């Protein structure tokens, strides 16, 4: 059981009425709180919840509608995303109760101050290195417009500016990260065919790929609903076509790909997690056509070349700088 869920269950007497659990982990919490429904924006956790509790959790960037009298937000990493989620929940709970639970190292003390916009926050519990806060909604806000909260910026490229649309919570929100900047300079001479931007975030790499290889089919994949929507907005802002997939890792990707291009993720909330990246290296060959290429950027300290060579083929370093390296390998 997730420690945040354990803290909630210490106060289960507070959750006897219809309840929405926002950002809930894929554990036993829905079994323990049969009156609760879930709202998830993580495709992997949503798949696990669907398998165990069919119809009791929704995958979306917007809060589901329902006759909730209270809601719990599991604190996400991003402050901007927390603002949006709290406003979305508070808008549905005039006079109701909004709870916030999170790890101390995840910033729950700081985030509890964000509850003050809706009433007087109270700390209810502190255990398992987590805290539980509550506020009664005295000032219910209007429903927030997610797209109005997007950060939009122009990326100057040799073939013209690219318009990027980044929603709250998306990796490197509102700016181009250093790893992707290095990889953008190494997208030449990719095999023609079906291209995949794995871990697409706001869709920068995928949009550049479609612009440079217009005859190629493009897919973009991310585990996060806000990233998936950001990528769709970025493609639309540039008049580009592409399939955007919500899936937990490379197993959800198409097969017979000509190339996989990636700035792979290695954070899950406040925790470092290399599982998705390592699984990409281990399983890329199953998704590439013969002669297909994996091209990715990674922190220089990560020992990826041995993994790539073990599971795919000879690994070349195409470029390095600013603490990152660009690796390339082809399926034989």
UniProtKB/Swiss-Prot annotation:
Principal localization reads cytoplasm
Keyword Transmembrane attached: no
> Cellular location of this protein?
Cytoplasm
Q: Name one GO cellular component term.
A: cytoplasm
Instruction: Identify the SUPFAM superfamilies for this entry.
Output: S-adenosyl-L-methionine-dependent methyltransferases
The EC number(s) attached to this protein equal 2.1.1.172
A Pfam match? MTS
Q: What GO terms in the biological process aspect are recorded for it?
A: rRNA base methylation
What domain of life does the UniProt record list for this protein's source?
Bacteria
Keyword annotations from UniProtKB, A to Z: Cytoplasm, Methyltransferase, rRNA processing, S-adenosyl-L-methionine, Transferase
Mention one GO molecular function. Answer: 16S rRNA (guanine(1207)-N(2))-methyltransferase activity
Please give the CDD domains that the UniProt record associates with this protein.
AdoMet_MTases
Q: Which reaction does it catalyse?
A: guanosine(1207) in 16S rRNA + S-adenosyl-L-methionine = N(2)-methylguanosine(1207) in 16S rRNA + S-adenosyl-L-homocysteine + H(+)
Its biological purpose is as follows: Specifically methylates the guanine in position 1207 of 16S rRNA in the 30S particle.
Subunit architecture? Monomer.
Q: Which family does it belong to?
A: Belongs to the methyltransferase superfamily. RsmC family.
What's the protein called, per UniProt? Ribosomal RNA small subunit methyltransferase C
Q: Which organism is it from?
A: Pseudomonas aeruginosa (strain ATCC 15692 / DSM 22644 / CIP 104116 / JCM 14847 / LMG 12228 / 1C / PRS 101 / PAO1)
């Amino acid at each position: 059981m997730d420690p945040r869920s354990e803290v909630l269950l210490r106060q289960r007497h507070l959750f006897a009425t219809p309840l929405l659990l926002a950002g809930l982990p894929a554990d036993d919490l829905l079994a323990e709180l049969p009156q609760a429904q879930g709202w998830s924006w993580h495709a992997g956790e949503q798949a696990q919840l669907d398998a165990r509790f069919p119809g009791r959790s929704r995958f979306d960037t917007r809060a589901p509608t329902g006759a909730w009298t209270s809601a719990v937000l599991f604190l996400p990493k991003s402050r901007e995303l927390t603002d949006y989620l709290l406003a979305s929940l508070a808008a549905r709970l005039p006079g109701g109760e909004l709870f916030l639970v999170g790890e101390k190292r995840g910033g729950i003390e700081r985030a509890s101050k964000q509850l003050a916009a809706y009433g007087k926050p109270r700390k209810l519990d502190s255990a398992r290195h987590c805290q539980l806060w509550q506020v009664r909604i005295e000032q219910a806000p209007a429903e927030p417009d997610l797209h109005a909260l997007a950060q939009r910026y122009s990326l100057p490229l040799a073939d013209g500016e690219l318009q990027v649309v980044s929603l709250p919570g998306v990796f490197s929100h509102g700016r181009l990260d250093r790893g992707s900047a290095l990889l953008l300079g190494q997208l030449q001479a990719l095999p023609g065919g079906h291209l995949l931007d794995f871990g697409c975030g706001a869709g920068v790499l995928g949009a550049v790929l479609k612009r440079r290889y217009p005859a190629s089919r493009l897919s973009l994949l991310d585990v996060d609903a806000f990233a998936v929507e950001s990528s769709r907005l970025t493609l639309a802002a540039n008049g580009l076509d592409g399939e955007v997939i919500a899936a937990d890792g490379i197993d959800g990707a198409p097969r017979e790909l000509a190339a996989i291009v990636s700035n792979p993720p290695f954070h899950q909330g406040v925790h470092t997690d290399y599982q998705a990246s390592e699984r990409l290296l281990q399983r890329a060959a199953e998704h590439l056509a013969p002669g297909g290429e994996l091209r990715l950027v990674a922190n220089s300290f990560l020992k990826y070349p041995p993994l790539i060579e073990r599971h795919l083929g000879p690994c070349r370093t195409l470029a390095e700088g600013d603490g990152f390296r660009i690796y390339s390998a082809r399926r034989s």
